[in-house]
Amino acid sequence: MKNAGPSQRQLRVGEQVRHAVAYKLQQGILLDDLLKNIVISVAEVRMSPDLKIATCFVSSLSTLHNVSPTDVVNVLNKHSRFIRREISYSLRQMKYMPELRFRLDTSFDNFSKIDSLLRSPEVARDLHHNDEFKD
C-alpha cells in the first residue's frame, strides 16, 4: 500500500496550515513592494508524511500587468520563514512548525486547457455522433 495518497492526518493538518497562511496573507503582513495590489489565493497545502514540510500551492491576481506569478512565488519563498513564524501563533497545537515552500498552482490553467479541448469542434462532433447511436 505504498503511495496510497496522503493520510487523513496529512489532509487535516494541510487544511489548517492553508487556512493560517491564507489568513495571514489576507491581513497583508508582507510589506514587499512587489506584493502591493496583488491578491494571493492559497489553493492547496500538501504536507510531507512527517508533517515537517508544507508545500503551498498559490495563485495570484494582479492589477499590475508587469508582475508575473513566478515573481510572486519567489517573493513568498523569500519571506517563508517570516510567514512560518507568523502562522505559528495560530497553530500552537503542532509539535513542529512545518517549513513552508511555495509553488505556483497550475490547476486553473489545466482546467482551462481541458475546457477548451472539450469545446473544440472535433470533440463536439464526436459527442453529437455518439448521441445518435443511443436512440
Curated annotation (Swiss-Prot):
Gene3D superfamilies: 3.30.300.20. The keyword rRNA-binding does not apply. It comes from the Bacteria. It is found in: Cytoplasm. InterPro entries: KH_dom-like_a/b (IPR015946), RbfA (IPR000238), RbfA_dom_sf (IPR023799), Ribosome-bd_factorA_CS (IPR020053). GO terms for biological process: maturation of SSU-rRNA. GO terms for molecular function: ribosomal small subunit binding. Keywords: Cytoplasm, Ribosome biogenesis. One of several proteins that assist in the late maturation steps of the functional core of the 30S ribosomal subunit. Associates with free 30S ribosomal subunits (but not with 30S subunits that are part of 70S ribosomes or polysomes). Required for efficient processing of 16S rRNA. May interact with the 5'-terminal helix region of 16S rRNA. This is Ribosome-binding factor A.
